[in-house]
């Protein structure tokens, strides 16, 4: 299995070339699909920039992708739960399975754009639902540890992850200037920089995750304009 995590496109942000940013990402992902294969793309929050009416335009823009995609809500996605559900067909807290692996999407904001901890009670229920899976990968826009300027402390959540053996990794967006791996206990937390917005890493890129048949997996950050592999991490499920 091979998937891509990209975040913080900020569609509609004033004084940014947001349309080109999205055109570029779509081109890069479609090229990856042709060259190496991509099972799905995950947009890890801040799909749009504050104005909820932008969501339709964003959805229309990414219809040019040649791969399936999933989304999480970021603090700039100031959209009501009903609009989110009707747009994407699932709520802001959602999980899905593909083969022997499960993927959990946790909401870390609200319609006001506040920073909130994921719903730990809901997470426990979803984790239990997928307890027999070989591995679980978690997507949260805002990192649940105060190890970045824009992170928030959610100790109940990180302890839950740490004590769940089949959780393999957590993916975070939000901090545009972070593209590395941070370790809490034994769990890796991956950041993917940004592909839009007006601040952050000097390049716009995304993160790739590859799960192999022998149950090993790796994740690395990718700069598609220069093609170096950055911050590679290898694990076993």
Please place each PLM-identified region on the residue numbering.
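Metal-dependent catalytic neighborhoods of phosphoester/phosphodiester hydrolases
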Residues: 16, 43-63, 78-89, 148-153, ...
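Active-site glycine-centered loops adjacent to acidic/histidine catalytic or metal-binding residues
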Residues: 8, 45-46, 74-75, 141, ...
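Surface-exposed cleft-lining segments at the edges of enzyme active sites
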Residues: 12-14, 47, 103-114, 144-147
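Alpha-helical scaffolding within the catalytic cores
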Residues: 24-27, 54-58, 79-94, 116-126, ...
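Binuclear metal-dependent phosphoesterase catalytic core
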Residues: 179, 183-237
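His/acidic metal-ligating clusters that form di-metal
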Residues: 27-41, 112-188
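N-terminal active-site segment of His-dependent metallophosphoesterases
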Residues: 1-56
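Beta-strand-turn-beta hairpins that frame and shape the catalytic cleft
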Residues: 1-4, 95-105, 127-137, 182-188, ...
């Amino acid at each position: 299995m091979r998937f891509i995590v990209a975040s913080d496109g900020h569609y509609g942000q004033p004084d940014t070339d947001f349309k080109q940013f999205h055109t570029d990402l779509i081109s890069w992902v479609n090229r990856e699909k042709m060259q190496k294969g991509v099972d799905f793309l995950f947009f890890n929050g801040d799909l749009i920039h504050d104005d909820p009416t932008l969501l339709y335009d964003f959805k229309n823009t990414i219809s040019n992708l040649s791969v399936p995609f999933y989304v999480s809500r970021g603090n700039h996605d100031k959209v009501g739960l009903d609009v989110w559900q009707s747009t994407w067909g699932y709520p802001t807290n959602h999980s899905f399975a593909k083969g022997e692996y499960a993927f959990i999407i946790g909401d870390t904001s609200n319609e006001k754009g506040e920073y909130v901890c994921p719903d730990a009670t809901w997470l426990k229920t979803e984790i239990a639902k997928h307890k027999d899976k070989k591995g679980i990968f978690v997507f949260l826009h805002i990192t649940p540890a105060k190890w970045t300027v824009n992170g928030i402390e959610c100790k109940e959540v990180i302890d839950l992850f740490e004590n769940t053996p089949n959780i393999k990794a957590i993916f975070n967006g939000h901090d545009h200037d972070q593209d590395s791996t941070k370790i809490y206990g034994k769990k890796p937390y991956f950041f993917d920089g940004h592909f839009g917005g007006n601040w952050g890493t000097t390049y716009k890129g995304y993160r790739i995750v590859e799960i192999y048949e022998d149950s090993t997996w790796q994740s690395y950050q990718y700069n598609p304009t220069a093609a170096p592999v950055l911050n590679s991490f290898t694990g076993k499920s």
